[in-house]
Design a protein with these regions (language model features):
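Flexible, glycine-rich terminal cap/loop adjacent to redox cofactors
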Residues: 8-19, 24-122
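N-terminal periplasmic "start-of-domain" segments of outer-membrane beta-barrel proteins
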Residues: 1-8
Length: 122
């Protein structure tokens, strides 16, 4: 079961599912979509608050497109992680999260941008 956790720091760090390191240690093939918060154009709130440090990272099964884990170190991470956890439990794919229509402007729009980029190499 995908149970989210959050460390309430500034900015918050939230996580759900397996980490990239855990998946690779088990020999699981994983596509990693990650982007520094400062480079996410679709996410204005961190810039407005002056908290642009951090990272949003998704581990995706390249065969099924299911999210295997996510780590969010950003403004509103404690809220965004709940959406990601629900998506994981419901079998929503990374592509469906990427193509979602979210409130504008909101931190949720980061999903469109982070998941749209090509996965990085191991």
């Amino acid at each position: 079961m995908a149970v989210p956790t959050t460390t309430f720091a500034t900015p918050p760090f939230a996580r759900v599912g397996a980490s990239e390191e855990e998946l690779r240690a088990k020999g699981v093939d994983v596509a990693v979509h990650a982007k520094p918060v400062a480079k996410i154009a679709a996410m204005p709130r961190p810039k407005v608050l002056g908290e642009t440090h951090g990272l949003i990272k998704f581990c995706v099964d390249p065969e099924t497109d299911l999210v295997l884990g996510a780590a969010l170190h950003t403004v509103d991470a404690q809220e965004l992680i709940n959406l990601v956890a629900l998506a994981m439990r419901a079998g929503v794919t990374a592509s469906e999260l990427r193509d979602g229509i979210w409130t504008h402007p909101s931190s949720t729009e980061a999903l469109n941008e982070v998941l749209a980029g090509p996965p990085r190499d191991a």
